[in-house]
């Protein structure tokens, strides 16, 4: 949650996108509707909404508190000279000469470049921006609203599977196929239709900079982004959304398993208070190391040799990757593997010459024999290995493994191992000054001012970082035990010679040890001693349960069951708390089953720890921070909590919600998403929370169970949390509800405002029809590319740095906050968007509340990069996600209707937590 996550390793890049390294287009433009067609509006939840549709609120003012500080940011000023001009939008259709549409990815840019080169005068000498799919833009109109062109393209790779010059599962390569093998570069005819679609005034950009956003302004910005993507594509870059990656080995670092972290650059145009800017940042994606396929598989699976490879796993890993085949040099996309090894996999080979009757006879041969006898290639090692299939499902085309090499710049989109992720983070860190140097160089190399289309419409991009004014908010005073108080320094504090503000008592507890490498007795003695120094009374454990050696190779569930049988046989009743020593330092398979058993079957608070022979005091203090919070204690709190001085909270009963949705790993489309909402309790505290967690259809971002009607009852998340607030706050209903939403993009703000907020209001009304609480709704974004730098220091910006001017939205209420101390890499600020405010906070009040909520995270003695409720929601979703066994979703499933789903989707449900832990900070 600190700058470790803001270090330039843009881990979003492990998600989405195909694994073939093919360029991806931006989202398609709105469809063009012919004038004689009356559009029919599709009914959606937003369209059917009763009452006015909410929109993000406008900024009411700027903050003034804090010490002013000059800063630089990675936004580069964009000047637009020709605001009176227009972009013209054209639809592009590509066909082969026989009329078939071109569906092959990646060929469109080559075809359109050829059109521009061949028909330059017919196009009136105009430059154009092409998105690689079906859309083209020009500055000024083309000579005609509809134009047809024919071009001949020298094909550089044959990715369409038509036999392709290697053994086909149904027939041998034809004479034409064999000729293509000997002459891989062959010409192909294409027909291109370019049709007028729309006109986009550049004046819309000026309107957007005044806060008057429209569909035209969004389209104009989209055109500018497409121009930059085309510019990068012509330099041979891999395009990933709005990022580009050069084929330069010096930009790549190995992270293990023949996977490389490839450094590239994100670029996007933004409308800001200071005008138009280009936001440019360093980003990283994972690519596969080019080279022999067999080398990749051995490294990726950590296999001893080619004969130890797990081929079912290899088939999933290789699917859709591109290979270059020796000796022809042709490129193909992998569609699968053969069922049998080369020396056993057969196909029908058609003889070259007809027989006496003029017929071509066939004979069955193996792939290995074909390559030896016909292609004169003796296989060195792959005769006993499966073949690469580059054909179609019903017409396989097999190539021996050793003849295939992976081509450069292919994204790796599978989930990374813990080791790979750690290596990626470590190797992609950049200190602020290094990042600035790299960005300046990249901007110079990109040479956007020489881009013809930008030049023709009078757009120029400054090479200087934008200067902004920030403010450093003072850290809030914290209260600790025995009446002591402290002011954090540089976003950090400690408990040296201090007690927790509300320490708990641990009386009935046990220790379980799944590890053979931990001195448990020493851990227990030290934990009791250090706990006492923090004010926690810890009795001696009832017993230490050691796992028997005979169980250590058993499946995780069996190991957990055996341990609980042992506990139940020796312990009368359920313990208050269990300390569990896991067998592994990270990602133990026991973690999920162990947590599930404790929380859902027995209602036991449990703390897991990594095995250690000699834990130090700091490690055990950090462990006690979690244990104390889980058992209902408080480690530290804001000094103003529970006092009238905390005016924004203490005057009126106020509940704070943190909302997040956690999705499965890349490629796991069948894994349900997990929605978590946490809520503050025991008003006027803002340091204690509880969570409600539900599953929902995979990749659904809007939370679906905020209200869940079951007959006349509401079984939704919000009711559960509101009832808990009421009972824990002396039977007071919240009059103010403050919501922090994480994980949504700007395009989803309207859904959050008009669907999720409506559901929360409905949940309140279902509890009391006359209840009208006031709402404040903010969205927190970490997945952006804005960074801040100190012009006179190589260090990160100080904790508490806030920016609400110049590069913020020209109309809407947003601000950037760097609450934490960036110790490594470059600090990534959190971008807060205030979407809705009925309460009426001033800019200073709201910014100080958000800043203070970064200091109440009970697991840490440092300010965190985003408010604690959001971190807790993320932790709760992640922890309950480990409960799920998704292999068979047919068991204990129920139906949920997705927002865009045509019918009910069966989603496996999470087991309910026992009541005595449901209201705890079990996730801490």
From Swiss-Prot:
Observed phenotype of the null mutant: Decreased DNA cytosine methylation at CpNpG and asymmetric positions at different DNA loci corresponding to retroelements, transposons and repetitive DNA sequences. Reduced H3K9me2 at IGN5 and IGN26 loci.
Gene Ontology molecular function: chromatin binding; miRNA binding; RNA endonuclease activity; siRNA binding
Record motif Nuclear localization signal, residues: 584-591
Keyword terms of this UniProt record: Host-virus interaction, Nucleus, Plant defense, Repressor, Ribonucleoprotein, RNA-binding, RNA-mediated gene silencing, Transcription, Transcription regulation, Translation regulation
Disordered: annotated segments: 1-37, 159-185
Cellular localisation: Nucleus, Nucleolus; Nucleus, Nucleoplasm; Nucleus, Cajal body
GO biological process: defense response to bacterium; defense response to virus; gene silencing by siRNA-directed DNA methylation; heterochromatin formation; regulation of translation; regulatory ncRNA-mediated heterochromatin formation; siRNA processing
Predominant place of localization: nucleus
Residues of the signal peptide: none
Residue span(s) of domain Piwi: 577-885
Source organism superkingdom: Eukaryota
SMART domains xrefs: DUF1785, Piwi
Biased composition (Pro residues): 26-37
Tissue expression remark: Expressed in embryos, mature leaves, vascular tissue of the sepals, stamens and stigma, at the tip of the style and siliques.
PROSITE patterns: PAZ (PS50821), PIWI (PS50822)
Domain named PAZ: residues: 292-408
Transmembrane segments: none
Alphabetical list of InterPro entries matching this protein: ArgoL1 (IPR014811), ArgoL2 (IPR032472), Argonaute_Mid_dom (IPR032473), Argonaute_N (IPR032474), PAZ_dom (IPR003100), PAZ_dom_sf (IPR036085), Piwi (IPR003165), Piwi_ago-like (IPR045246)
Biased composition (Low complexity): 162-173
GO cellular component, one term: ribonucleoprotein complex
Complex and partners: Interacts with NRPE1 (via C-terminus). Binding to NRPE1 is required for its function in RdDM. Interacts with turnip crinkle virus (TCV) capsid protein P38; this interaction inhibits probably RNA silencing ability of AGO4. Interacts with SDE3. Binds to RDM3. Binds chromatin at loci subject to transcriptional silencing. Interacts with MBD6.
Biological function: Together with RDM3, required for transcriptional gene silencing (TGS) by DNA methylation and repressive histone modifications (H3K9me2) of several chromatin loci. Component of the RISC complex that associate with the small interfering RNA (siRNA) pathway involved in direct cytosine methylation at endogenous DNA repeats. Forms a AGO4/NRPE1/siRNA complex in cajal body, facilitating its function in RNA-directed gene silencing of target loci. Required for CpNpG and asymmetric DNA methylation as well as histone H3 'Lys-9' methylation (H3K9me) at SUP and SN1 loci.
Protein family (similarity comment): Belongs to the argonaute family. Ago subfamily.
Name of this protein: Protein argonaute 4
Organism expressing this protein natively: Arabidopsis thaliana
């Amino acid at each position: 949650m600190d700058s470790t996550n803001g270090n330039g390793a843009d881990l979003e890049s492990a998600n989405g996108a195909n694994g073939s390294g093919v360029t991806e287009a931006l989202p398609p433009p709105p469809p063009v509707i012919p004038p004689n067609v009356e559009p029919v509006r599709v009914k959606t939840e937003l369209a059917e909404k009763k009452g006015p549709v909410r929109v993000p609120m406008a900024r009411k003012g700027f903050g003034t508190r804090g010490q002013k500080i000059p800063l630089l940011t990675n936004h580069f000023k964009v000047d637009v000279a020709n605001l009176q001009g227009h972009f013209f939008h054209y639809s592009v259709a590509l066909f082969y000469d026989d009329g078939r549409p071109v569906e092959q990815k990646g060929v469109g840019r080559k075809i359109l470049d050829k059109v521009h080169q061949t028909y330059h005068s017919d196009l009136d000498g105009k430059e154009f921006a092409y998105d690689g799919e079906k859309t083209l833009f020009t500055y000024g109109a083309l000579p005609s609203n509809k134009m047809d062109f024919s071009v001949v393209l020298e094909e550089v790779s044959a990715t369409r599977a038509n036999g392709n010059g290697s053994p086909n599962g149904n027939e041998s390569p034809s004479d034409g196929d064999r000729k293509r093998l000997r002459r891989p570069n062959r010409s192909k005819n294409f027909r291109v239709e370019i049709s007028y679609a729309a006109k986009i005034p550049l004046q819309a950009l000026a309107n957007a900079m005044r806060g008057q956003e429209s569909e035209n302004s969004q389209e104009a910005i989209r055109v500018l982004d497409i121009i930059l993507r085309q510019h990068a594509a012509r330099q041979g870059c891999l395009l990933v959304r709005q990022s580009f990656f050069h084929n330069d080995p010096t930009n790549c670092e190995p992270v293990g398993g023949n996977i490389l972290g490839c450094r590239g650059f994100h670029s996007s145009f933004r409308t800001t208070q200071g005008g138009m800017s280009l936001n440019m940042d360093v980003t990283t994606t994972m690519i596969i190391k080019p080279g022999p396929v067999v080398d990749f598989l051995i490294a990726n699976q950590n296999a001893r040799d080619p004969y130890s490879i797990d081929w079912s796993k290899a088939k999933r890993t290789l699917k859709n990757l591109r290979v270059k085949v020796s000796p022809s040099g042709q490129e193909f996309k992998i569609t699968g593997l053969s069922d049998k090894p080369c020396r056993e996999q057969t196909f029908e080979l058609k003889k070259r010459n007809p027989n006496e009757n003029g017929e071509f006879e066939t004979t069955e041969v193996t792939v290995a024999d074909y390559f030896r006898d016909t292609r004169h290639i003796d296989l060195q090692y792959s005769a006993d290995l499966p073949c690469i299939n580059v054909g179609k499902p019903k017409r396989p085309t097999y190539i021996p493994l050793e003849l295939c090499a992976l081509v450069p710049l292919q994204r790796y989109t599978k989930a990374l191992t813990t080791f790979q992720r750690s290596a990626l983070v470590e190797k992609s860190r950049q200190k602020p000054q290094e990042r600035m140097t790299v960005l300046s160089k990249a901007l110079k190399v990109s040479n956007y001012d020489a881009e013809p289309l930008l030049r023709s419409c009078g757009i120029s991009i400054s090479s200087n970082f934008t200067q902004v004014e920030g403010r450093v908010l003072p850290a809030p005073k914290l209260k600790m035990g025995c009446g002591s108080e402290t002011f954090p320094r540089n976003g950090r504090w400690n408990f040296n010679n201090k007690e927790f503000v509300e320490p708990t008592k641990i009386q009935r507890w046990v220790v379980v040890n799944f590890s053979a490498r931990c001195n448990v007795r020493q851990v227990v003695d030290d934990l009791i001693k250090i706990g006492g120094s923090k004010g926690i009374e810890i009795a001696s454990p009832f017993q230490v349960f050691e796992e028997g050696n005979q169980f250590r190779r058993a499946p995780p569930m069996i190991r957990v069951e055996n341990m609980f049988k042992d506990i139940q046989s020796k312990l009368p009743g359920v313990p208050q708390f269990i300390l569990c020593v896991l067998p592994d330092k990270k990602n133990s398979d026991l973690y999920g089953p162990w947590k599930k058993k404790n929380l859902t079957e027995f209602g036991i608070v449990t703390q897991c720890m990594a095995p250690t022979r000699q834990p130090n005091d700091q490690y055990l203090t950090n462990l006690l921070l979690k244990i104390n919070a889980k058992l209902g204690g408080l480690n530290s709190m804001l000094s103003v909590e529970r006092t009238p001085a905390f005016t924004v909270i203490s005057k009126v009963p106020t509940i704070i919600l943190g909302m997040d949705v956690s999705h499965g790993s890349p490629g796991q489309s069948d894994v349900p998403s997990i929605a978590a909402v946490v809520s503050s309790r025991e008003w006027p505290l803002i340091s204690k929370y509880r969570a409600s967690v539900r599953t929902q259809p995979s990749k659904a971002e809007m939370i679906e169970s905020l209200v869940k009607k079951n007959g006349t009852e509401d079984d939704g998340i919000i009711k559960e949390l509101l009832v808990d607030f009421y009972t824990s706050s002396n039977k007071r209903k919240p009059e103010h509800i403050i919501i922090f939403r994480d994980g949504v993009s700007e395009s989803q703000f309207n859904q959050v405002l008009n669907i999720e907020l409506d559901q929360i209001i409905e949940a309140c009304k279902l509890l009391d029809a006359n209840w009208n609480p006031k709402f404040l709704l903010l969205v927190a974004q970490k997945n952006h590319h804005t960074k801040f730098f100190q012009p006179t220091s190589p260090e990160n910006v100080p904790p508490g740095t806030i920016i609400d001017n110049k590069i913020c939205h020209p109309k809407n209420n947003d601000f950037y906050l760097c609450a934490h101390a960036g110790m490594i890499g470059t600090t990534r600020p959190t971008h807060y968007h205030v979407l809705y405010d009925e309460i009426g906070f001033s800019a200073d009040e709201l910014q100080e509340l958000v800043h203070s909520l970064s200091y109440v995270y009970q697991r840490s003695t440092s300010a965190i990069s985003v408010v604690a409720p959001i971190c807790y929601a993320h932790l709760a979703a992640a922890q309950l996600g480990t409960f799920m066994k998704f292999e068979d979703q047919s068991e204990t499933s129920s139906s949920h209707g997705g927002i865009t789903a045509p019918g009910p989707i069966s989603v496996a449900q999470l087991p309910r937590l026992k009541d005595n832990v449901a209201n705890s900070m079990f996730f801490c």
